[in-house]
From Swiss-Prot:
Alphabetized UniProt keyword annotations: Amino-acid biosynthesis, Aromatic amino acid biosynthesis, Lyase, Pyridoxal phosphate, Tryptophan biosynthesis
Sequence positions bearing N6-(pyridoxal phosphate)lysine: K88
Gene responsible for this protein: trpB
PANTHER family: TRYPTOPHAN SYNTHASE (PTHR48077:SF3), TRYPTOPHAN SYNTHASE-RELATED (PTHR48077)
Reaction catalyzed: (1S,2R)-1-C-(indol-3-yl)glycerol 3-phosphate + L-serine = D-glyceraldehyde 3-phosphate + L-tryptophan + H2O
Cysteines joined through disulfide linkages: none
Protein name: Tryptophan synthase beta chain
GO molecular function, one term: tryptophan synthase activity
Top-tier EC class: lyase
Role, per record: The beta subunit is responsible for the synthesis of L-tryptophan from indole and L-serine.
Cofactor(s) needed: pyridoxal 5'-phosphate
Length: 398
């Protein structure tokens, strides 16, 4: 490993496994990030955009009805209320300010559910940067409202037809573009994964989620929660929630992976629970892979969790036992999606529904246990209504 300013590893996970040509680019990004973090003018501009453009701080909402019949108090951290509809907007604003600071004139990004693409498109529109969004052709189909939003805001959406036509293929295509155009282009990675320094940058630009949550829950309840719960694909919303609680050892950190059609079917996206460490997307982290090391197709009903690997800090937190990573199936997530809508009047993203489903399981398995839980409601479900409507109609669920 060449010298870096910040530690590129979390235990054994992380690193900079990229073509030689990109090492200086990553180091330039790291240097710009470290300098920006110490520059009051950068911080002021970032915080101003978060407050007056994105709408921070987001609310902490108590569920009045969902946990009736149990002694659990369940709060939702409302990242779904952020401009753009998900937590993605937080770190996108930070990274675009960084790109401008480095003199880059073009932004590229990958997206699965389309939420990161939308966040990138809206920030590029506002800050006057052209952008190209790489998206698996399959995801372009299942997330059509977000594709229209991106195009409406001036982004070029590039459907990727290679491989499984999903997020992992979009990531590879974006990385190729970056290697060819790094002099004028910033690759705005959408999650806390990829080569160093991306996992650290994304965490630092998302950690206000947990900071706000801690202050809000102490004000409302006078104590810390027993657990904070977030869904995990690449892991940015979860690391944003976890970071301020890592040293609070009384608080369980629960990251929920997608079990898809059931772990036993092989159709899932749970590399922490069922993968093996390997090199992928510029980092060392658990990956879903075959016996001979080929990357397996991940699967989840939610495009944003349909990823065969995970951010290296989550791999580290899992390896030291500080965080736990259970999984939730498509069907459990769909049920939670429906329950939150029907009992609280909030339509969650299918991604966030995985975290909600696990919280409801915790409440209902121990109805007499007094628990204070916080779920990071990482995004809203507008993008998923057509997918869910089709399934509910077929199954007679509504």
């Amino acid at each position: 490993m060449t010298d870096t300013i910040l530690d590129p590893y979390f235990g054994e996970f992380g690193g900079m496994y990229v073509p030689e040509i990109l090492i200086p680019v990553l180091k330039q990004l790291e240097k710009a990030f470290v300098e920006a973090q110490q520059d009051p003018a950068f911080q002021t501009e970032f915080l101003d955009l978060l407050k007056n453009y994105a709408g921070r701080p987001t609310a902490l909402t108590l569920c009045r009805n969902l946990t009736k019949g149990t002694k659990t108090k369940l709060y939702l951290k409302r990242e779904d209320l952020l401009h753009g509809g998900a937590h993605k907007t937080n770190q996108v604003l930070g990274q675009i300010l960084l790109a401008k600071r480095m003199g880059k004139t073009r932004i590229i990004a990958e997206t699965g559910a389309g939420q990161h693409g939308v966040a990138t498109a809206l920030a590029c529109a506002m800050l006057g940067m052209p952008c190209r969004i790489y998206m698996g052709a399959k995801d372009v189909e299942r997330q059509s409202p977000n594709v229209f939003r991106m195009r409406l805001m001036g982004a070029e959406v590039f459907p990727v037809t290679k491989g499984s036509s999903t997020l992992k293929d979009a990531c590879c295509e974006a990385m190729r573009d970056w290697a060819a155009n790094y002099e004028n282009t910033h690759y705005l990675i959408g999650t806390a994964a990829g080569p160093h320094p991306f996992p650290t940058i994304v965490r630092e630009f998302q950690k206000m989620i947990g900071e706000e949550t801690k202050a809000q829950i102490l004000q409302r309840e006078g104590r810390l929660p027993d657990a904070v719960i977030a869904c995990v694909g690449g892991g940015s919303n979860a690391i944003g929630m976890f970071t301020d609680f890592i040293n609070e050892t009384s608080v369980r950190l629960i990251g929920v992976e997608p079990a898809g059609k059931g772990i036993e079917t092989g159709e899932h996206g749970a590399p922490l629970g069922h993968g093996k460490p390997g090199i992928y997307f510029g980092m060392k982290s658990p990956i879903m892979q075959t016996e001979d090391g080929q990357i397996e197709e991940s699967y989840s009903i939610s495009a944003g969790l349909d990823f065969p690997s995970v951010g290296p800090q989550h791999a580290y937190l899992n390896s030291i036992g500080r965080a736990e990573y259970p999984s939730i199936t498509d069907d459990e997530a769909l049920e939670a999606f429906k329950e939150l809508a029907q009992h609280e009047g909030i339509i969650p993203a299918l991604e966030s529904s995985h975290a909600l489903a696990y919280a409801l399981k915790m409440a209902r398995q121990n109805p007499m246990r007094e628990q204070l839980l916080v779920v990071n409601l990482s995004g809203r479900g507008d993008k998923d209504i057509f997918t869910v409507d089709k399934i509910f109609s077929e199954r007679g669920m509504l």
